[in-house]
């Protein structure tokens, strides 16, 4: 059974950014992990995966092969950590706003 994980990336649709789901598994040798999904997205939906995402996934694939770990698991670790870091400042701002609202209600 194939081992893969689901991820969402912001993609470009004629200047509009929208999240799109992708499935990352272990690609065949010589193929980018998102090669076929990127082609489908372009051909069928007119969208493109940002170059920085393609490059990052390619680098993670190289690292996974070098260290003998499954690419999907490495992506969960690397991309999950990055998403947590991005979410943290926003979460703190939301918590701070809630705390200020609570204090205002108590006053």
UniProtKB/Swiss-Prot annotation:
Organism superkingdom: Bacteria
Entry-linked InterPro entries: DUF2610
Comp. bias (Acidic residues): 90-99
Region (Disordered): 82-107
Pfam families, per database record: DUF2610
Name recorded for this polypeptide: Uncharacterized protein RC0324
